[in-house]
């Protein structure tokens, strides 16, 4: 009414017309903004999702930085919050024997296989707030939209959101604990793997009131017959979408990955009394090997004989090869002591499994050669290996259609004029790799600023968060909602 009072005095009938126009046009617009009547559900898919991302990002074991590892105190607090959000979306919730959080809607009398949507709740050390969390919260928000619009009850197949307890592998140096357990590929021996403090996986499970037995581990496994597909939303962790000025992209496959641990033992001694020529210094050997790895992965043709080693290397197969030394530890780690032992990690990734396997073999051979030259003892342990994972073509096509529908319906500021939805390869490992052993998988990437990830500088625009959630709503609508019932209800 304040707006009407500012107008010149008019005949009462004019005021009635204005009020009628207000009621007919302005109120539905306001209602649409509040309840999603515009079909875009901004308040749930953008505003509430971003607030929840920030809330989860504050739950940390670190002081002043984000760290949330497998079943840590912060992980337990985060689980309680995620469960409350799942219940808010109308889902039935539970925690399995590997600490994964599940939220599921089960249609009455449905015999169809479930659609699983998930990502991981753990983080690296000094992490950003989007890696993993975005996939979980976007999925919960999408199902909340279905709940508030009455479409949740029209689902024709079960839809389940899973927040996996561990993907990064920070605490136990073994990735995909959560998703591999669900896929049924986690060996019983994992229970005896220990962290840096000597605490085993079994110890941690029992400390958190879980059984920590082989039988309990088997209970986590889903049967392939009960699952139709798995979909994961994740930040790109690369710069391609930003360069293309596009908020979303579909993933055609995930690079294979191998993690190694190199252990070098030399002669510990006094930094001032042992002559240089008489030293057996593992630090120098480690430094040389780090540079050797860099050269091997930058210029593999200098080390590999194509015909003998593989017979299949091409410019394309070698293009996605990347190698990283991310951790180096020395003992006793004192400034005036020649180290007695140096350990470092190696991460090797490639789109072509033959390339990756050959690089692993070649580097392991070079480690032994360099250590012999330096008169130090060494060993190479393989800690993790995962084959490249292709995404299901039909699932990818459906995600692409949902993405295209999303982008065309959003505001002009979110769209890039023309062009098709980008199709990307992922150089990073994801829970979808483990879940591919259970069912067909698909992935949706979300643009992140500068391609930065595993860093507090990780950043995603609010509207891109919105786009990801809306794409999931559209995907679920197209693949799990009774279209005939939905049309009848809306009419």
From Swiss-Prot:
CDD domains named among the record's database cross-references: M20_bAS
Binding locations of Mn(2+) 2: 131, 168, 454
Cofactor binding, note field: Binds 2 manganese ions per subunit.
Keywords: Endoplasmic reticulum, Glycoprotein, Hydrolase, Manganese, Metal-binding, Purine metabolism, Signal
Subcellular location: Endoplasmic reticulum
Glycosylation sites: 109, 265, 343
EC number: 3.5.3.9
Pfam families assigned: M20_dimer (PF07687), Peptidase_M20 (PF01546)
Record field: catalytic activity: allantoate + H2O + 2 H(+) = (S)-2-ureidoglycine + NH4(+) + CO2
Signal peptide from the UniProt entry: 1-32
Record's GO cellular component terms: endoplasmic reticulum
Key word Hydrolase present: yes
Highest taxon of source: Eukaryota
Cofactor names: Mn(2+)
Keyword Phosphoprotein: no
Assembly description: Homodimer.
UniProt similarity note: Belongs to the peptidase M20A family.
Name of the protein in question: Probable allantoate deiminase
Source organism (scientific name): Oryza sativa subsp. japonica
Gene symbol of the encoding locus: AAH
């Amino acid at each position: 009414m304040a707006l009407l009072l500012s107008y010149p005095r008019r005949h009462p009938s004019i005021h009635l017309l204005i009020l009628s126009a207000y009621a007919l046009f302005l109120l539905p617009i306001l209602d649409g903004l509040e309840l999603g009547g515009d079909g875009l559900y901004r308040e749930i898919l953008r505003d509430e999702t971003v607030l929840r991302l920030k809330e989860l990002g504050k739950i940390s074991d670190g002081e002043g930085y984000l760290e949330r590892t497998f079943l840590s105190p912060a992980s337990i607090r985060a689980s309680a919050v995620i469960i409350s959000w799942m219940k808010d979306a109308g889902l039935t919730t539970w925690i399995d024997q590997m600490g994964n959080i599940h939220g599921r809607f089960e249609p009455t009398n449905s015999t169809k296989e479930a659609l699983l949507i998930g990502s991981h709740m753990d983080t690296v050390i000094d992490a950003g707030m989007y890696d993993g969390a975005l996939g979980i919260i976007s999925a919960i928000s999408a199902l909340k939209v279905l709940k508030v619009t009455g479409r949740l009850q029209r689902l024709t197949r079960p839809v389940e959101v899973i927040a996996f307890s561990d993907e990064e592998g920070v605490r136990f140096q073994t990735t995909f604990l959560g998703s591999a357990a669900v896929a049924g590929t986690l060996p019983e021996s994992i229970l005896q793997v220990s962290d840096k403090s000597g605490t085993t996986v079994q110890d941690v499970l029992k400390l958190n009131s879980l059984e920590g037995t082989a039988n309990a581990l088997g209970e986590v496994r889903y049967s392939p017959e009960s699952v139709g597909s798995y979909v994961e939303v994740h930040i790109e962790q690369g710069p391609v979408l930003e360069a293309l000025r596009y908020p979303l992209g579909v993933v055609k496959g995930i690079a294979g990955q191998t993690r190694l641990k190199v252990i070098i033992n030399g002669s510990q001694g006094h930094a001032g009394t042992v002559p240089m020529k008489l030293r057996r210094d593992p630090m120098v050997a480690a430094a040389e090997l780090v540079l050797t790895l860099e050269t091997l992965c930058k210029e593999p043709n200098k080390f590999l004989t194509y015909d003998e080693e593989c017979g299949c290397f091409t410019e394309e197969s070698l293009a996605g090869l990347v190698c990283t030394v991310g951790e180096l530890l020395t003992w006793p780690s004192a400034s005036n002591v020649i180290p007695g032992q140096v350990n470092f990690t190696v991460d090797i990734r490639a789109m072509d499994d033959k390339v990756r396997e050959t690089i692993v073999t070649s580097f392991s051979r070079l480690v032994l050669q360099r250590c012999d030259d330096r008169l130090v003892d060494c060993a190479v342990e393989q800690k993790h290996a995962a084959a490249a994972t292709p995404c299901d073509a039909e699932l990818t096509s459906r995600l692409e259609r949902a993405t295209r529908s999303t982008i065309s319906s959003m505001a002009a500021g979110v769209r890039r004029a023309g062009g098709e939805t980008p199709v990307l390869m992922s150089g990073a490992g994801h829970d979808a790799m483990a879940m591919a052993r259970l069912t067909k998988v698909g992935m949706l990437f979300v643009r992140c600023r500068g391609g930065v990830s595993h860093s507090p500088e990780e950043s995603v625009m609010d509207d891109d968060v919105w786009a990801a959630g809306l794409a999931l709503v559209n995907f679920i609508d197209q693949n799990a909602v009774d279209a005939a019932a939905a049309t009848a209800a809306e009419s």
